[in-house]
Amino acid sequence: MFGNIGWGEFMVLLVAALVILGPERLPGAVSWVTKSLRQVREYASGASQQLKDELGPEFEDLRKPLADLNQLRGMTPRAVITKHLLDGDDSILTGNFDKPGSVSFDKSNPGTKAVSADPSTPTAPQNKPLAAGERPPIDLDAT
């Protein structure tokens, strides 16, 4: 209910309520607000229960289309294309064309490779760190 109000705004509202209502009327106002919220909650739950009672088994038939609509509300254009046109494969959109068994680069930690579980995939030999003053080997094919 108060998802869009941060702590700073909430504190400003409390200080404003204290200044406007004063310390003697503030507890009464807080109790009135809590009673009102409880009453609204009871009305809402009573209305939903009354709807379930009146519709009976048809209520479940109504819930299915509503659940489908609720699922579509969170869909972005990219998610719709991925789900319906690409069968869930978003490699075209993300550019990640690695196969599940291949070695892929970890984007969160540059310079490291993810280890694959496939033993047939060849791996590069592990390089030892260079000693102080040692020059790195030169690859003549790369230069």
Curated annotation (Swiss-Prot):
GO cellular component: TAT protein transport complex
Record's keyword terms, sorted: Cell membrane, Membrane, Protein transport, Translocation, Transmembrane, Transmembrane helix, Transport
One Gene Ontology MF term: protein transmembrane transporter activity
Coiled coil segments of this chain: none
Membrane topology value: Single-pass membrane protein
Entry-linked Gene3D superfamilies: 1.20.5.3310
Tagged with keyword Calcium: no
Membrane-spanning segments: 2-22
Signal peptide positions (record): none
InterPro entries (alphabetical): TatB
Region described as Disordered: 97-143
One GO term (biological process): protein transport by the Tat complex
Subcellular location: Cell membrane
Origin superkingdom: Bacteria
Subunit composition and interactions: The Tat system comprises two distinct complexes: a TatABC complex, containing multiple copies of TatA, TatB and TatC subunits, and a separate TatA complex, containing only TatA subunits. Substrates initially bind to the TatABC complex, which probably triggers association of the separate TatA complex to form the active translocon.
Functional summary from the UniProt entry: Part of the twin-arginine translocation (Tat) system that transports large folded proteins containing a characteristic twin-arginine motif in their signal peptide across membranes. Together with TatC, TatB is part of a receptor directly interacting with Tat signal peptides. TatB may form an oligomeric binding site that transiently accommodates folded Tat precursor proteins before their translocation.
Family recorded in the similarity comment: Belongs to the TatB family.
The name this protein goes by in its record: Sec-independent protein translocase protein TatB
Species, as recorded: Rhodococcus opacus (strain B4)
Lineage of producing organism: Bacteria, Bacillati, Actinomycetota, Actinomycetes, Mycobacteriales
